[in-house]
Amino acid sequence: MSKRDIVLTNVTVVQLLRQPCPEPRVEAEPEPPAQPQPQPEPIKEEVPPPPPPPPAPKKVRELIVGINGFGRIGRLVLRACMEKGVKVVAVNDPFIDLEYMVYMFKYDSTHGRYKGNVEHKKGQLVVDNNEISVFQCKQPKEIPWKSVGSPFVVEATGVYLSLEETKAHIEAGAQRVVICAPSPDAPMFVMGVNEKEYNPSSMKIVSNASCTTNCLAPLAKVIHERFGILEGLMTTVHSYTATQKTVDGPSKKAWRDGRGAHQNIIPASTGAAKAVGKVIPDLKGKLTGMAFRVPTPDVSVVDLTCRLAQPTPYSAIKDAIKAAAKGPMAGILAYTEDEVVSTDFLSDTHSSIFDAKAGIALNDNFVKLISWYDNEYGYSNRVVDLVRYMFSRDK
């Protein structure tokens, strides 16, 4: 070994001796295996209970009408029902067959041809797609009102007027009965005057009074409530009706009633003014009247001459009637200052149309008031209005 190699070896040894002694290597203990973490239980979503079933729909009551008697008023009541959207389910008339009913309803010499569709199908009268059962029973007790749903019955024959006579409709299934004439004992109502007195719990049969009472009573109500009526006389100049003769013939009631309707002005009796006392009790015994039957087919006029409790100028009377016609009696009482004549009121639906220019006053206490009415069409519309009102009051 050379001297140089010895030196290098010694240096290397010295260097090795000077290095720190390495720490003994400690083997790390193995970590214990990770314990599985408990998984949170899944949140159970609460399922809401099913909604309750919807309540059963309330059965909507529907007004249905039956008509007994298909004469002037019966046919016009059907027209009024069609115009007002009232459902007619049956017509009874023993003297008119189905085909003739179609003809009579379609054509009218006074009010013109019916503007809708009229036909018959499968034994029914069909008006504007409304199917109407037709019966030909001679007695009210025979009419099967139950079979068509127990309607409100319009008694339009002019024959059955009393409670005893018309209760047969109820026994046959009618729900209520409205008599299209004054009745000797049935409660009497005039729309716009006393309909609020109707009691559905005790009144199944009522009277719609007469066409003349329907004209006079609204007028008398306005005047009496504002100015007071001490006493009065009424005259109605009335168109001829089906009960009169086209030529002279026999009459049991009064001889001159049998004279030709087209040829004469015929004085006649009327209970219309006295009947006002039944619908306005405060006027009982204060009004009476008479009629002149004249040669016109339709539209009549009332002349009420009365003594007032409160001195009142005629202008104030006009103002009171005009206000009522625009307010609480709209559709029933009307007001005009036009130069009108009877044919201007053909097919007018009002009960009473006050003619402001035709009336006169002797002084502030004594006046003559004039009011027109279509004794057929206006009256028939009030019949339907009374039926609708009664239905609205029934529970």
Swiss-Prot record:
PROSITE patterns for this protein: GAPDH (PS00071)
UniProt pathway: Carbohydrate degradation; glycolysis; pyruvate from D-glyceraldehyde 3-phosphate: step 1/5
Binding site residues for NAD(+): R72, I73, D93, K138, N375
E.C. numbers: 1.2.1.12
Location of this chain's protein in the cell: Cytoplasm
Keyword Cytoplasm tagged: yes
Sorted UniProt keywords: Cytoplasm, Glycolysis, NAD, Oxidoreductase
Active site: C211
Residues the record lists as binding D-glyceraldehyde 3-phosphate: S210, C211, T212, T241, T270, G271, R293
Reactions this protein catalyses: D-glyceraldehyde 3-phosphate + phosphate + NAD(+) = (2R)-3-phospho-glyceroyl phosphate + NADH + H(+)
Amino acid composition bias (Pro residues), ranges on this chain: 31-41, 48-57
Domain of life from the UniProt record: Eukaryota
Region (Disordered): 19-59
A GO CC term attached to the entry: cytosol
InterPro entries linked to this entry: GlycerAld/Erythrose_P_DH, GlycerAld_3-P_DH_AS, GlycerAld_3-P_DH_cat, GlycerAld_3-P_DH_NAD(P)-bd, Glyceraldehyde-3-P_DH_1, NAD(P)-bd_dom_sf
Entry's Gene Ontology BP terms: glucose metabolic process; glycolytic process
Role: May play an important role in regulating the switch between different pathways for energy production during spermiogenesis and in the spermatozoon. Required for sperm motility and male fertility.
The family this protein is said to belong to: Belongs to the glyceraldehyde-3-phosphate dehydrogenase family.
Domains: entry comment: The testis-specific N-terminal extension mediates tight association with the cytoskeletal fibrous sheath of the spermatozoa flagellum, possibly via interchain disulfide-bonding of Cys-21 with sheath components.
This protein's name: Glyceraldehyde-3-phosphate dehydrogenase, testis-specific
Organism expressing this protein natively: Bos taurus
Protein's gene: GAPDHS
